[in-house]
Amino acid sequence: MLQPKRTKYRKPHNVSYEGKAKGNSYVAFGEYGIMATNGAWIDARQIESARIAISKQLGKTGKMWIRIFPHMSKTKKPLEVRMGSGKGNPEFWVAVVKEGTVMFEVANIPEAQMKEALTRAGHKLGVTWKIVARQGAQ
């Protein structure tokens, strides 16, 4: 699963996923992509399962780009522990996805197969999404 090799701080402040994405908002590398239509934290496990779903459809000629990375750790306190006594330990890693962020891109496979791959991947993500084409691709 994806996670940073090293971070400056173990426990970051919570980053808001509300609002529109400033960058990463168009299909830059492939022909089609999945764009988030609302904001959310996407877990590293969700990214990995979406990657596997796309990989199974691609075959040998298809290419895939993952445009998000889980940079932020999320903390959790142990079960049955009273509130207080500081912040919990880092439990998992998330990517902050805002509305309009392109998360995955694919290329070099037929259009029907491409849309099937992106649809399967989209169902693995905890965010509403739509399939977008590259500008001038059609």
From Swiss-Prot:
Q: Which UniProt keywords apply?
A: Ribonucleoprotein, Ribosomal protein, RNA-binding, rRNA-binding, tRNA-binding
SUPFAM superfamilies named among the record's database cross-references: Ribosomal protein L16p/L10e
Keyword check for Ribonucleoprotein? yes
Recorded hits in Pfam families, A to Z, give: Ribosomal_L16
Q: Which InterPro entries match?
A: Ribosomal_uL16, Ribosomal_uL16_bact-type, Ribosomal_uL16_CS, Ribosomal_uL16_dom, Ribosomal_uL16_sf
Which residue spans traverse the membrane? none
Q: Which GO terms describe its cellular component?
A: cytosolic large ribosomal subunit
Keyword check for RNA-binding:
yes
Q: Which domain of life is it from?
A: Bacteria
Q: Which GO terms describe its molecular function?
A: rRNA binding; structural constituent of ribosome; tRNA binding
One GO term (biological process) = translation
HAMAP family reported in the protein's UniProt record: Ribosomal_uL16
Q: How does it assemble?
A: Part of the 50S ribosomal subunit.
Q: What does this protein do?
A: Binds 23S rRNA and is also seen to make contacts with the A and possibly P site tRNAs.
What family is reported? Belongs to the universal ribosomal protein uL16 family.
Q: Which PANTHER family does the entry mention?
A: 50S/60S RIBOSOMAL PROTEIN L16 (PTHR12220), LARGE RIBOSOMAL SUBUNIT PROTEIN UL16M (PTHR12220:SF13)
Record's protein name = Large ribosomal subunit protein uL16
Record organism: Mycoplasmoides gallisepticum (strain R(low / passage 15 / clone 2)) (Mycoplasma gallisepticum)
